[in-house]
Amino acid sequence: RRRRRRRGHRGRRGRGGRRSRGRRRRAA
């Protein structure tokens, strides 16, 4: 049984900028 640990999966996906193109989420 392998358990995948999701660590910061939110920041990793929005890093390429492919999903949200017109929106820039840099300054929180």
UniProtKB/Swiss-Prot annotation:
GO MF entries: DNA binding
Metal-binding in keyword set: no
Region described as Disordered: spans on this chain: 1-28
Keyword Manganese attached: no
Assigned keywords, A-Z: Chromosome, Developmental protein, Differentiation, DNA condensation, DNA-binding, Nucleosome core, Nucleus, Spermatogenesis
Any Gene Ontology biological process: chromosome condensation
Tissue/organ expression: Testis.
Source domain of life: Eukaryota
This protein's GO CC annotations: nucleosome; nucleus
Compartment annotation: Nucleus; Chromosome
Coiled-coil stretches noted in the UniProt entry, renumbered to this chain: none
Protein's job: Protamines substitute for histones in the chromatin of sperm during the haploid phase of spermatogenesis. They compact sperm DNA into a highly condensed, stable and inactive complex.
Protein name: Sperm protamine P4
